[in-house]
């Protein structure tokens, strides 16, 4: 078998191989059908054989054949099968090969169509030039490029279509002899290297008349073409044919009109060219914004060209009608945002496919947006300013205007009008040359889209312009970009990069984070002009529309009628709003006066301000930067005066610095930038200690300067690195994750004197201050400043204790506080300066930096500068702080100038107008805001001593009333009594003079409030802890208890305070109602309550809020941020200048709501409600005690630490939330029942599921006994509520954190007003609070309103956010604030009179 198998199979295999040979050469035999038939037969044979063998394989296996033989057989069969498969494949390929691929097959592309296709692919046309230079052939598509027809060019000279300047080159290359030589070279050189020439070819004009009438430029239009020249093909020449030598050229456009995929849309037109249809699908699908605008503008531009121009849409369609297609040259237009768009339209004639009649045109418009990002537009040297020669300062004549090139920039040519105003928004072209020698002047700001160019040299409105020779002095690096950093579009530095930009006349901060620029400038050792004084206000309210910060420039005993005037206080706001009061003639006059004074002030204070500005810039929130370009830059005219009174070299600086308050949500990137700047400082050789010192100096130096300003010896307080941990600030800034911290915002890295070069925007503006500063200003040694620092520490302690800035280091140690609080000092507390100063010069509202005038209370940096007033220093008794707070309120409004107090005169508390110096009005205001009155009213502790917070009336309060002052005094007395009592009972009250907790602690906008901040003060935070927004529920004014019990500046103090509070709580808890009443009587609370009620009735709606007054005041400070709406818009400070849109109470509330939402500490801004003080005192005490316990118990209690980023836990036990005594508790219980019912009804009425919010079980307040909850837990819970609810909901009554605000409505006073069942706190938590029963009038309604503003908090205390779904209801049901304002029949809940007035 084996033999048989071998002999039989092998021959078959051999035969198959032989037969396969033809297959191996498919090119030959396969052509014939016979070969094909033979192959098919072979395939069949092989297939049959394979099947036969495979069928017998099983039998073969049984044969007695050696295994190797079987394997061979199997392998043979496998090969046969492969051959069969290959045969099938080859046979299937034969047909294709024969038809299409074989050399005999027909070509795929017709030769006639190949040429045009190639030309189309090349995007060019072909022409052939003979040795005489004549065109012997040109392709038909030349019409698309040169508008010439084929017959127009054939047999014409190629030179006729070449641009004259290029003809010579062409002639030199292609003259006959050279052409021949060239062609000869082409024969010898590689054909792959064609000769390439760029030429401009003439395009045909459309009609003779146009040629005759138009100018040569119009008649002759050229298209730049790239020519690829080749000699005649060698093959043609070698064939011996007598062909004339010629050159073949392909000309193509140099660059395609739209290299990248352009946007496009299609329009259909009738034969007359009218638009019939617009197809936007392609544009819409591109997902690019503003496609409607681009279509509208493109069509408008397309149809706008007239026949008199090189082309028109009419001619375009005529050409399309004749030729069937046409295309326009590239044309351009700009979009609304200034983006330049290049467009080209190609049209085709549309015919009816059946009748071939012309029906119309289809036009495709190709659009290409040009990259118009920040492209520095070199300023023509003949225009604007030329870069100064190296070494020369740029002296710009006042008349030199740099017009901003930015698409949106508005050049203000009039130097008198513009000048240094360039405040944040005025991107006066910082283009003013950078002062640094050799640096060419770049005016990136000129490109700032939003910046408004002010003439660089023009003096600030109110301030005398710098003489050309002076201009170098005032340059603040901040205005300029840091030298190496191109100024950001919105960067204040928009102008020259050099740190010392020309006297910051250009306030080009347009909207950039000047802080970064300043830091960079510092890190880079940018200019050293301290004159520019970095006082550029880092945080400028500028952005906050309403925040006017009036700063009495002239601190020394002068009543600055317009703080602006004195301070030149063109508030940064002014610059941003263009409202600066300084613009007013009075302001100018005042600024001039102050400028006279400026010379008196030493340069040090100014420098310190500059540093503060830097620190502020560094730390200011992104929002602040973005909105308020930090400050008026040197442009601020105010700067001048400010130097005197405020000491901020740039008068504005302090004012501006105070203002940066816009809240920005873009913190991460800013924070990173800040970190980079700090790291750069370190890398540049600055030790951490030096950096810390710089920042400390920046923030704290000026404090005392104001006070001494009158003396003409303003001292800069420099935080002594010795006193502070040098690295503390730096570490804090680098480690801090919450860019929203107000403190951080305020802490502006201020360069040390060297760094002050950066002088933030405010510095350079004041020529006078700058000039005078130079020689006179000197920084005092740390030792010299220590006294001031102590004062400042006292104030800073308060600030730190406030949620503003938790600084564990603040400890009790003033130095540490200052360093930690460099920011606070920037807050405006420079040095407390003897708090008792006769008349606290009000800080320029804006300038947190401005030092307090002599004898003035430490100027609290206007928190207003910070978003929100959270900061408002509650330095009790510090009128300045109060002022700033009010300024906050005033500034909060979109119009900073609008007086915040609806009732008060501008001079009054609210002076919304920065110009109205609070100081003056104070003198006359019933509240006696005058410094003297203030002093009297506010017991001012010695330096560092804390003054019990005087509940200042919020700007919003209807009118300053003398009675309020009395109440304040009474409250202060009560506070003191309580302190004594507490000390006696628990020795709890360990008031650290520097530690008065500032209610302002919460970042105005930081939801986390300070809670996010590494909680130096978990407890201090409590006082501020209102809620993310600074405990909206808490009275804006800090409760006196809070002041007394104010969280210590350091963690240690906090723990001590907690222990004391726990003890006190235990004591009070164990005390029966009778004992509590005795304590109340001992404190004089009953009388205060009675008075408070009377006052409340007087207070209008405010009084109802009086407990809320604290809140209201804060609100005032916060201004009607929302008025009714809760959206906590920082920028939306509803024209704080404006009176609250709703009732003042509501306005306040809304303000509070908004700011609290901002994470501001309600308390921060407010002093305390005057009328509610008694209630507040006692309730606060209880609340704080219970609150702490509750916080421990409550899941919502956010550890009382600033840590809580959300600030939900912001409410801290410290918060004076309504506290109920036993009687009140009983009343509350009764009320709870009714309120629960009412709430349920409310819930049913409201679109949102309020039942949950109000259902007793959910409501912590409801389910737990009201008193228990209210007393302790309610407050802590409130915080969670704050942010959960919509901003507007905050306005809603339902949220009404009855406890928020620390108004402690539950106090006896509250209960008396509320009535047994109307405990405001209880009610507020309940939906019914929205429409509190008329019984609740007075206090409750006020509370309600406030609650509306801070509903989250107030409810939050209840502890169940859901419980306060009412607040959420606000969002669904509309603004609760509005509801509160309009008495709605809520389950029979009559609104209190106060509310009714809302």
Curated annotation (Swiss-Prot):
Positions of modified residues (N6-acetyllysine): 609, 612-613, 680
Subcellular location: Cytoplasm; Nucleus
Stretches the record annotates as Interaction with CREBBP: 949-1113
Catalytic activity: L-lysyl-[protein] + acetyl-CoA = N(6)-acetyl-L-lysyl-[protein] + CoA + H(+)
Pfam family, one: DUF1518
PTM section of the record: Acetylated by CREBBP. Acetylation occurs in the RID domain, and disrupts the interaction with nuclear receptors and regulates its function.
Chain positions with N-acetylserine modification: 2
Gene3D superfamilies: 6.10.140.410, Helix-loop-helix DNA-binding domain, PAS domain
UniProt modified residues of type Phosphoserine: 215, 544, 562, 594, 687, 720, 847, 850, 1040, 1304
InterPro entries reported in the protein's UniProt record: bHLH_dom, bHLH_NCOA1-3, HLH_DNA-bd_sf, NCO_DUF1518, NCOA2/3_DUF4927, Nuc_rcpt_coact, Nuc_rcpt_coact_Ncoa-typ, Nuc_rcpt_coact_Ncoa_int_sf
Major site of localization recorded for this protein: cytoplasm
Deleted gene: phenotype: Defects result in diverse phenotype of postnatal growth retardation, such as dwarfism, delayed puberty, abnormal reproductive function and mammary gland growth retardation.
Highest taxon, organism lineage: Eukaryota
Alphabetized UniProt keyword annotations: Acetylation, Activator, Acyltransferase, Cytoplasm, Methylation, Nucleus, Phosphoprotein, Repeat, Transcription, Transcription regulation, Transferase
EC number(s) per entry: 2.3.1.48
Protein name as catalogued: Nuclear receptor coactivator 3
Species annotation: Mus musculus (Mouse)
Primary gene name: Ncoa3
